[in-house]
Amino acid sequence: MVGPARPQIVLFGSSIVQMSFGHGGWGAILSEVYARKADIILRGYYGWNSSRALEVVDQVFPKDAAVQPSLVIVYFGGNDSMAPHSSGLGPHVPLTEYVDNMKKIALHLQSLSDFTRIIFLSSPPVDEAKVRQNQSPYLSEVIRTNDLCKTYSDACVELCQELGLEVVDLFSTFQKADDWKTVCFTDGIHLSAQGSKIVAGEILRVVKEAEWHPSLHWKSMPTEFADDSPYDLVSADGKQTVNSSEWTYFWEEQWD
């Protein structure tokens, strides 16, 4: 382990999580925003559903760990909501089982510590035409529809309301933009840089508005090694140094 110890923010989910550290990804955005404040830890698993996640949740988040995460952001549902395959194989999970799985995951995370906070992300919509267009010749037919996405998204939101958890309703949020189909995805399913900006912005909004003590909003968290130093850059007048520990001018977008 490296020091100093920082709060941990864990991203736990399927491909939208695994790919979130790619160029312009929402995980990368959070890493930039929380630089020198918290460690963003990636636990993303391409193709996974809530059933597979439930099988390993106690290994990813052991209850006896010396340090527990301050925040866990969870996304499963996109693969669960795929239409069932005629073979009985594949990632589809019936709706009631999906809700039960997500509830068990939430309860496990709540048991980690009194200060572990949780945000669920619901299933975003898809560009159905583009999904069909990009069908891989190596895979049996992948059936994703917005009717199914909405059903699973609504169930996730309802579960979070029942458990008192924070949730980002991605299905509704994405569709606030008229051109969401063309700007939010790379292949009709996975997120473009613009789609990731929407996700990051919603997460940061939820964290800012949440009444958590201590606050996990990035502006409320101390910056590591932020003391003034004679080794800092020298000001234009040449008489003093300028502390750069809080600079954000290089961000592509100035986040609140």
Curated annotation (Swiss-Prot):
It is found in: Secreted. GO terms for molecular function: hydrolase activity, acting on ester bonds. Gene3D superfamilies: SGNH hydrolase. It is an enzyme of class 3 (hydrolase). The active site is at S15, H213. The keyword Ribonucleoprotein does not apply. Specifically expressed in anthers (stages 8-12). CDD domains: Isoamyl_acetate_hydrolase_like. One of its GO terms (cellular component) is extracellular region. The keyword Signal applies. Its EC number is 3.1.1.-. One of its GO terms (biological process) is lipid catabolic process. It comes from the Eukaryota. Glycans are attached at N49, N79, N243. Keywords: Glycoprotein, Hydrolase, Lipid degradation, Lipid metabolism, Repeat, Secreted, Signal. Residues 1-27 form the signal peptide. Belongs to the 'GDSL' lipolytic enzyme family. This is GDSL esterase/lipase CPRD49. It comes from Arabidopsis thaliana.
